[in-house]
Design a protein with these regions (language model features):
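N-terminal active-site segment of His-dependent metallophosphoesterases
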Residues: 20-103
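Hydrophobic helical h-region of N-terminal Sec-dependent signal peptides
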Residues: 11-12
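Bacterial N-terminal signal peptides that target proteins for export
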Residues: 1-7
Length: 268
């Protein structure tokens, strides 16, 4: 049967209108807007901090589901003019849903200063890791601010059923020597700290030995447990500072100087 020519315009209008009614699957990794966010912001961090002898940065994490609190965090931090960058310790999503990553990216993009986001364990659910890689980049990455190297790691071993080397010791070993002439201090950041159940604790002590090979290791940062935590985990002088979740409306501010470092907790 031939389709009547007079009905073509009506059919075309219905087809176009129907396109707006298509509901994408929540795990479709259909990305709109900025991608490779960490790389773009790292370039800005390194440029802004070049030749600086004092670095001041914020750590926070676990903004999953707390959108209003995260938006308030951004507004609060934007009132300051003394922070160089932000490290988000991971878990921007609760269920690994694509839109969760996009919503959190758009909130964080309101910051007046650059930021990076680590991969959290909730970010690995469903197609979350794939979405994270598209929007933010590789889960293992590093950058240099002033003469401080920041090594950011995927430590979510349990989410991969131990099928991958997590933490990635090859990456760590390479980072010790990579651009070694450009830094003399180091900060290691992760979502899950050693001795948490989700960390690969079979290699916890090996992990600590590796990171202590970095020049001038200052301290480590983490998130994940939804409360603030400070402890010399291995009793070797290296402190671990764990950020609270955004629900509790606080974050860390670290200042690294030629003589050492200071930390404070800011509330909003």
């Amino acid at each position: 049967m031939k389709f009547p020519k007079l009905l073509y315009p009506s059919f075309l209008c219905l087809l176009i209108a129907g396109c707006d009614m298509i509901d994408y699957h929540p795990y479709d990794v259909h990305i709109s807007g900025e991608t490779d966010v960490n790389a773009h912001n790292i370039a800005q961090i390194e440029q802004n901090c070049q030749n600086k002898t004092t670095i001041r940065f914020v750590t926070m994490g676990d903004s999953q589901r707390w959108y209003d609190e995260t938006d308030d965090f951004v507004s609060h931090l934007n009132k300051r003019d003394d922070i160089d960058f932000v490290i988000h310790g991971g878990d921007v999503s609760d269920f690994g849903v694509t839109d969760e990553f996009l919503w959190q990216r758009d909130i964080m993009n309101k910051l007046k200063i650059p930021y990076v986001i680590l991969l959290g364990n909730h970010d690995c659910l469903g197609t979350g890791e794939e979405t994270y890689r598209v929007i933010f980049g590789d889960p293992n990455f590093s950058f240099i601010a002033g003469r401080v190297k920041f090594v950011c790691l995927n430590t979510n071993a349990i989410e991969f059923d131990y099928s991958r080397p997590i933490p990635d010791f090859e990456f760590l070993a390479a980072q010790i020597r990579d651009h070694e002439e450009e830094f003399d201090k180091t900060v290691v950041s992760m979502h899950i700290r050693p001795f948490c159940n989700e960390f690969n604790n079979n290699v916890a002590h090996v992990f600590q030995r590796y990171i202590k090979e970095f020049p001038g290791l200052q301290f480590c940062t983490s998130a994940h447990e939804h409360h603030r935590f400070e402890k010399d985990l291995f009793e070797d002088g290296i402190m671990y500072y764990m950020s609270d979740c955004m629900k509790n409306r606080n974050y860390y501010i670290f200042t690294i100087t030629p003589d050492g470092y200071e930390r404070e907790v800011a509330y909003y």
